[in-house]
Design a protein with these regions (language model features):
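Secondary-structure transition motif
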Residues: 1-126
């Protein structure tokens, strides 16, 4: 599987979606800018990269690290918001202040509600 990325540009506060080609230099991040007139490689060190988990939510939307998803812990509980994070060992997890689980176990139960950059307020609702 070829890794897919999206990026949050910390300078312009814009989320850049795939297809996003990325090259990691010694101290630089190069991205291929298809939106520019010359379709050129540009250096942007103000990026926060988010890799695709390779999984989709219950609506078929691709889940990236940094997404905020909504999911009920069980059939009796109200939906809660969770951040998608990469944990030690490389596994993707759903994390909230009170609960966490492996993403691969519950990805078909969750729905993408936003991301940590554009919707940080979702994670404060607990």
């Amino acid at each position: 599987m070829i890794p897919k990325f999206r990026a949050w540009d910390c300078s312009s506060l814009i989320l850049m979606y795939s297809p996003l080609e990325v090259i990691f230099g010694d101290s630089d991040i190069w991205i291929f800018d298809e939106d520019s007139e010359g379709n050129e490689w540009i250096v942007n060190n103000n990026l926060s990269l988010m890799q695709s988990t390779g999984l989709t939510d219950k609506n078929g939307n691709e889940i990236f690290e940094g997404d905020v998803v909504k999911m009920a812990k069980n059939v009796y509980s109200e939906p809660t918001y969770y951040e998608v994070v990469r944990h030690r060992g490389g596994a993707y997890r759903l994390e909230s202040k009170q609960y966490g689980c492996e993403l691969w176990l519950r990805h078909t139960d969750c729905e993408i509600a936003g991301n940590i950059y554009e919707n940080p307020e979702l994670l404060d609702v607990e």
